[in-house]
Amino acid sequence: MTEKSNGVKSSPANNHNNHVPATIKANGKDESRTRSRPQSAADDDTSSELQRLAEMDAPQQRRGGFRRIVRLVGVIRQWANRNFREEEARPDSFLERFRGPELQTVTTQQGDGKGDKDGDGKGTKKKFELFVLDPAGDWYYRWLFVIAMPVLYNWCLLVARACFSDLQRGYFLVWLVLDYFSDVVYIADLFIRLRTGFLEQGLLVKDPKKLRDNYIHTLQFKLDVASIIPTDLIYFAVGIHNPELRFNRLLHFARMFEFFDRTETRTSYPNIFRISNLVLYILVIIHWNACIYYAISKSIGFGVDTWVYPNITDPEYGYLAREYIYCLYWSTLTLTTIGETPPPVKDEEYLFVIFDFLIGVLIFATIVGNVGSMISNMNATRAEFQAKIDAVKHYMQFRKVSKEMEAKVIKWFDYLWTNKKTVDEREVLKNLPAKLRAEIAINVHLSTLKKVRIFQDCEAGLLVELVLKLRPQVFSPGDYICRKGDIGKEMYIIKEGKLAVVADDGVTQYALLSAGSCFGEISILNIKGSKMGNRRTANIRSLGYSDLFCLSKDDLMEAVTEYPDAKKVLEERGREILMKEGLLDENEVAASMEVDVQEKLKQLETNMETLYTRFGRLLAEYTGAQQKLKQRITVLEVKMKQNTEDDYLSDGMNSPEPAAAEQP
């Protein structure tokens, strides 16, 4: 009947749909089971439920449509809440590997509403912990630049505005905007300081409580808080044109000095930055002194004597630019003590000039000392290099070296200085730890070393050892790097320049070697059976100035001592190269192997004889020691026996005689 009423043939899908009404009738029971079902069962995917609802016939869907919609909404809501909780509770495995155990939060528990709130709080705290600035990072340095700007603004313009009333009144709206913008930056800096990490046991601390305690208990925190006290509120009592009420903003100076220190460390031109920094300090002092001079002149009275600022009623001296430039000129002459200024008249003027002279002497001494030291540091490398040249010149003159050779040596030194190749890498890097030296050497030389055929597919540890042993060498035009028949003790890698393989006449060129090429690597391995042996097979000459890296045979053997497997790999690699080039005599290799076996047997026999001799000597020493020990034991036994007999006799003589019989 079902098939006829539907007008279609029965199918598995239709048969399945026939059972749907029964399922719908049991919705109430299903809902109760769903509420009592464990959490693990409730976590099943709802896709099957959606599919089951979609497969229902239209009439059946209309009969229980509202109930199914309600149930579907409930299931979707439950599924969304579950995924939301899982998203918050899921730990970041990548970050957890780098965060300390004290920062790892416990996974949120799924349960009632209170547990959800706790989980949300912990998740928020966990995310908040990630926003910790590393004081050695780039973002912290950029923030130092941001905070240094308002600090420098306050240090320069607050004093000027307090002294020059025209400057304060003429641009009041500009100062109002800049003042409160700097206040916002100050407040932001206070919070950033609370989120700035520090190192403890070599690890960056990210615990908010530790960060807060580390900052709050410092003097800098007190100064930072004092610098953001809203003293501007006093404007309502005394008027808005009193910028001296904001002098507490000057207490935030430490951040500017910290920015200067970090910039000096980061910059590639530290000497130039030190000079610029020193000039900035001097200009700020001169600026402050000019402002104070104008303020003193205002308090005494403009134009009352020759020392103070002229009367501002005079049009020549009555505008702001002339006021500041005149005071700045007077301050510069006074502090540098290089010009004549009007003499003081009143006592307070004398005291101020005396104070200025003392400050000027300190400034002059600081300039001379710092600039002289900086110039000496800047010229230290040049002076050391020039001393080497002078020593070589003196030696060549003493030994009466030819002018041509002397000119060649001077040109070689000139090439080194012009191309900045005078630095001794080992001397410069000797103060670094071995690991850092290795990393620098790897970054500089590893790609070059990998170009050598015998070092391809070599063990990484051995390559690191070899990289540390590469020595740069510079050859002049026409210099022979090696000659045919010379014993090969080094291998060379060309960094820059052109080398030519020439005939014995030194003119005919057979081949040209450029940057990245290498030669001499086979000869330093001393591979047995090589037709070349350890001798050079060609003349190699530098066409111009050439920069090469040199690796000596002794350094290679010292490095492979700790890597015996790598040594075998290198020798095998060298044999393969020689075989490809037809330079390996297999008969000689076999003969050398037989010779090696015989030598090993002879060495073994020698070692056995040596061991036998040593064993015989030790046995003789052991026998002699046993005899001496037995003799000493015998002597001790005799002495013990004699002592026992003597003690027995002495005891018998000292015992009392038997008492005589009593008389009747």
UniProtKB/Swiss-Prot annotation:
SMART domains: cNMP (SM00100). Residues 597-651 form a coiled coil. The chain crosses the membrane at residues 145-166, 177-197, 223-241, 247-265, 273-296, 320-354, 355-379. One of its GO terms (molecular function) is cAMP binding. The keyword Nucleotide-binding applies. GO terms for cellular component: intracellular cyclic nucleotide activated cation channel complex; non-motile cilium membrane. Residues 167-176, 242-246, 297-319 are extracellular. GO terms for biological process: calcium ion transport; potassium ion transport; sensory perception of smell; sodium ion transport. Residues 1-49, 644-664 are annotated as: Disordered. It comes from the Eukaryota. Keywords: Calcium, Calcium channel, Calcium transport, Calmodulin-binding, cAMP, cAMP-binding, Cell membrane, Cell projection, cGMP, cGMP-binding, Coiled coil, Ion channel, Ion transport, Ligand-gated ion channel, Membrane, Nucleotide-binding, Olfaction, Sensory transduction, Transmembrane, Transmembrane helix, Transport. The record marks 364, 368 as: Central gate. Residues 380-456 are annotated as: C-linker. Residues 460-580 are annotated as: Cyclic nucleotide-binding domain. Residues 337-340 are annotated as: Selectivity filter. 3',5'-cyclic AMP binds at residues 536-537. The olfactory cyclic nucleotide-gated channel is an heterotetramer composed of CNGA2, CNGA4 and CNGB1b subunits with 2:1:1 stoichiometry. Belongs to the cyclic nucleotide-gated cation channel (TC 1.A.1.5) family. CNGA2 subfamily. The C-terminal coiled-coil domain mediates trimerization of CNGA subunits. Pore-forming subunit of the olfactory cyclic nucleotide-gated channel. Operates in the cilia of olfactory sensory neurons where chemical stimulation of the odorant is converted to an electrical signal. Mediates odorant-induced cAMP-dependent Ca(2+) influx triggering neuron depolarization. The rise of intracellular Ca(2+) levels potentiates the olfactory response by activating Ca(2+)-dependent Cl(-) channels, but it also serves as a negative feedback signal to desensitize the channel for rapid adaptation to odorants. This is Cyclic nucleotide-gated channel alpha-2. The lineage of its organism: Eukaryota, Metazoa, Chordata, Craniata, Vertebrata.
